[in-house]
């Protein structure tokens, strides 16, 4: 089965000719018939700006499973789960939030 290709230190992975932002399964919030995302750690790292811009403009992400560090934050990418279409991308303070709208490709 073909899977995305990422690089250590990059917040993106290549899939079907696109460089897509990778988001972490640990920040997913299931609801009644919905799946939302809330990453509470947006900060000053210069990687955030192009990462958020890519989610907003492409409206597509790769959901990943990660090893968590002692602080509960994603530390190392373990696998790719799926690509998703997303909408309602918002950044408020240190929170990045959006809604998953459609599962596009499966990798697990």
Name the predicted role of every residue range:
Residues 1-107:
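Short helix-coil boundary/hinge micro-motifs
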